[in-house]
Structures are given as C-alpha cells and as structure tokens.
Amino acid sequence: MDIKINDITLGNNSPFVLFGGINVLESLDSTLQTCAHYVEVTRKLGIPYIFKASFDKANRSSIHSYRGVGLEEGLKIFEKVKAEFGIPVITDVHEPHQCQPVAEVCDVIQLPAFLARQTDLVVAMAKTGNVVNIKKPQFLSPSQMKNIVEKFHEAGNGKLILCERGSSFGYDNLVVDMLGFGVMKQTCGNLPVIFDVTHSLQTRDAGSAASGGRRAQALDLALAGMATRLAGLFLESHPDPKLAKCDGPSALPLHLLEDFLIRIKALDDLIKSQPILTIE
C-alpha cells in the first residue's frame, strides 16, 4: 500500500524516503542550517526528503531537561522551513488539542511511542485527515501494532505509516528485531514501514536522567533494517552532537550525512531492483 505525501510516494516497494532532521527545535538559525544541508544532500542523491523536528519533548526524564521552543514558535519555524525549502514537514503531538493546529502546518503528524495506545489522542489525530506516523512502542510486539491501526481506521483515517524504534531488552537497553518489520507489514495490510535508527541506538546509564547512545553503530543498524525492504528511514543529525540539547549521543554528525546516505541508497536500490521472493 502506497501513501502520497505531497509529490512523494511512500511505499515498501518504492525508493526509500528520508525522514530526517533534528531531535528538537533549538533555534530558527540552527534549524535552517540543518535543513539546508539535508536538502542539499538529498537533492544531490535523488532521495525524497521530509524534514523532521519536535517542537516539544514532553516526555523528558527530568523536569529540568530542555523541551523545545513550544507549539506556537515551533509552527512558525516549520512554516519558514516549508516556505524556504518547499519540502514536507513531520512533527509529533502529545495532546489532542495540538493535533489540528499542527495538521494545518505540517504534512505528517507523529504519534509518539509512549502515547500510541492513548485513544483520545489517536482519534484527534485521525480526525485531522493528515498522514500519521505511528511510532511502535518499545513495550509492544510488532503484531500488536494492528490494534493501533484499527483504532485509526475506526476513527476514519487509513493514511498511516508504521515506525520501528527498538524494543526494550531488559533494563536500560533497546534492540531491533529484524523479523518485526515483516510482521508489521503482514499484520497491518502492508502499510509503509519506516525505521527510526537513531532512537533505536539509545541506551541509559542506571540512575541517569539523560539518554546515552551508540551512534558509532548507526550505519550497521540502518543497513540491516533497510535490507528488509522498507519504505523509509528516520534519521536525526546535529551539527555538533556534543552540544545537542536532546539525544546527542545517538545523533549522526551532520557532516557525515552524505557518506551515510550514499551507502543507504545503494543498498535500497539493490534490494528493490529484485522481485519480491515469497517463501511459504
């Protein structure tokens, strides 16, 4: 099943789409700088591109952690991104009242993993009519995503994307089950499945409020996931990850973006040049 996002076709058998940007909006200047580099690289490589950032990180572990610029300022920044670069934008919402204002600016709205079973939020998102990206909760099996998909269908919206972002593996660790990509496709009507590689690299030190990460393994994990024939890759970068206000240890250094994507595109092109082989 393919989904249209403006002039972009998103489907498991179509060339992969990059959902990329920064974890959280820090300022207008840094946002435009990061987005400009993404646009330059993706246009050079011929990769369809959707800009990603959060206006509010409402689920930070510490009340003292940076959350973002807020809804009002965030929407202004997204409007400037769209006006300057002419690209679609995706951002996440956390409360039902945010859904309609965000949907009026952003092309895709995202359901956070921790909130994916919140029915009131699901219904409010569905009613916007926008394309919705559903983050798979760390605590759910891939097949359980079907229940969330059915909620959206009952609320009148079938324009859905499914996003893997890792599964809890004991305490303070995430792993990615490569078989889960196929399970989500099979149980959810072959909806587009994308892979959030940077959040899947998160770790946490016992007792720490801040997430750690394993960015050195980002390419290995991304290639493994994309080899399963996915619709897209979800990737966060930062000009200087050490200075990032959220999830810096998992962020790809921005200057490595082109070399990273060259390898991802080469694999995606190879995988999708071959016919699907069904093994019963």
Curated annotation (Swiss-Prot):
GO BP annotations listed: keto-3-deoxy-D-manno-octulosonic acid biosynthetic process
Catalytic activity: D-arabinose 5-phosphate + phosphoenolpyruvate + H2O = 3-deoxy-alpha-D-manno-2-octulosonate-8-phosphate + phosphate
Domain of life: Bacteria
Keyword flag Transferase: yes
Associated pathway: Carbohydrate biosynthesis; 3-deoxy-D-manno-octulosonate biosynthesis; 3-deoxy-D-manno-octulosonate from D-ribulose 5-phosphate: step 2/3; Bacterial outer membrane biogenesis; lipopolysaccharide biosynthesis
GO molecular-function term, one example from the UniProt record: 3-deoxy-8-phosphooctulonate synthase activity
Keywords: Cytoplasm, Lipopolysaccharide biosynthesis, Transferase
Protein location: Cytoplasm
Cellular component, GO, one term: cytosol
EC number: 2.5.1.55
Keyword Lipoprotein: no
Family to which the UniProt record says this protein belongs: Belongs to the KdsA family.
Record's protein name: 2-dehydro-3-deoxyphosphooctonate aldolase
Gene name tied to this protein: kdsA
